[in-house]
Amino acid sequence: MIALIAEKPSVAKDIARIIGATGRNDGYLSGNGYMVTWAFGHLIQLAMPEAYGVANFRRESLPILPPDFQLIPRQVKAEKGYKADPGVLKQLKVIKEVFDQCDRIIVATDAGREGELIFRYIFHYLNCRKPFVRLWISSLTDKAIREGLDNLQPGERYDNLYLSAKSRSEADWLIGINATQALSVAAGQGVFSLGRVQTPTLVMICGRYLENRNFVPAKFWQLKAVTASGGINFTAQSTAKWEQQPEAIAALQRVKDAGQLVVKSVERKEACQEPPLLYDLTTLQKEANTKLNFSADKTLSIAQSLYEKKVMSYPRTGSRYIPEDVFDEMPERVALLGQYSRFAGYAAGLDGTPLNRRSVNDGKVTDHHALIITENLPGELSKDERAVYELVAGRMLEAFSGKCVKDVTTALLSGGDTDFTVKGSVMKEAGWRAVFGEPETGGDEEAASLPPLQEGEYLPLSGVDLLEKQTKPKPLHTESSLLAAMENAGRELEDAELKASLKDAGIGTPATRAAIIETLFARQYIVREKKNLVPTDKGLAVYRIVRDKKIADVEMTGMWETALAKIEAGSMDADMFRKGIEVYAAQITAELLSVQLSIANGETCSCPKCNNGRILFYPKVAKCSNVDCTLTIFRNKCDKQLSDKQIVELATKRKTGLIKGFKGKNGKAFDASLVLDEQFNIGFSFPEKKAKPKK
């Protein structure tokens, strides 16, 4: 008997159908010599500190460095603390019974780092010793599954992948647990989550936010001239930018006095734009955020759904290339899109022509190739699924299309000792840009086309204007720009060799970056304002504490990512990595514990009760910094969360302004002011009802 374990029930059922295991049982399918069971994501996790006899959030317990990590079933919240998920316990029992009855195991969890870890943790937790082989496929079509089953890989081939996943999991535990507890102990109250990748990501968001907010724009002036040649009007802008307005006005007058412009030079050239590479997950997430306003997490979820519906390849890929053998199938995929209404016309024109090979490179394919559609046309899809499918399908057509070719003309004009420049372009061959029919957006200075200007030609000056402009700050991060910053964090480093080594690793991985961003939302460190990511007071408070600490070091985080990639490649020892990460965990713990701090933002005031301390703000309360003072103000009042500003007003004036939206025990909303009485208890003051006018 052969056991087969998939990552989730839907995948297990698809594989079971193909291998003839159609008998339904509780937690598994059977038949034709197979027993097919499943996990549902991570069933096993690393045990928390209490499993090692360590008291949580105690200075003397830190750093927590377990000699050997224990594995436990996935936990869920209970009335007191956490307990094992009953559904997980039940399925683990089924998996153990299936494994016990079989001679060998086929591992059919997702073909990636997390899929490998899901199986290996179950395997080790159950103390299983059965031999196993690996089903390694890049799509869930029947054809891919059959080919994968005919070409099962030795389980040990993926030992390094497992060691890398295990090392990542343990590193995240060591850094996250120790840093979170150290900061929380130092703060004195509340729990403030930190993480190996989470914290550098927060620092990037906060740093950009503060840079944007504190930016002081500087004015400058440019000239815009209107002229014509051969009956065609066009505008040109001065190459100079004046920081002093009087200088710009003087230049304006000299141009007016000249009354004409002369063509100093004309450059004409053919510009070719290569088609974009195929999508990897991060590029798809960036594009979906920009074009569809989807979060990274939503895009990943939709891509996973399309993968499970057999219409898209494995989504968690970091490669933008396909190998030669997959490229051989692309003419059929292009022809298939001829049956898809959105792309039918373009695909028909591309069918039968030589496909562009820019995205084809065996050496640049990682565990999985770039995102492509499968041989199955989609049936019923949701609106969001169809939007993501069309991004991937359209990008495929773009990637395999010809270059976009333009004739570009750049002219330099002069008048009254001021030079002006103008650029125009004419499309010769749309190439890949014709897929979505989106024209390239040019800058302010680019015209659609220019007349045939000649060097030395004099042009009439129809008008000239003085333009007042100002410098602009870097924009706030969106999820798209943040993903790029995480992916290319190494490019902001000064050391060229380090840049090259970190380029492929970045901060986080394609599979984890969405979850990292969602964690920052869950921790209430950031919020969305339209498309922008904006830190909360809590997020900024944490940033101010950790911004110069090791845990926030982008370079260090990138180096750990590089080390994990080396473990996966078999060029670094996992035990050596573990020792290094333990030293790092001890360093950041000591660094955070040594800081004298409380989580408070700049808006605070003296304590009205003892007059010695200052009010410090925490997620659930505000309290006096004087340890002998008992003043505590809970943020939640009748289902209304008090802001720092309202608490300061209450402490300084003993009464707030009218606050709307309190909720009584009967569920009805009411408005009131809060009052701090002589005993420092908080009560309500209701607005006086206006007397009804007499009839």
Residue map of PLM features:
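Metal- or metallocofactor-binding catalytic centers and their adjacent structured scaffolds
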Residues: E243-Y279, Q285
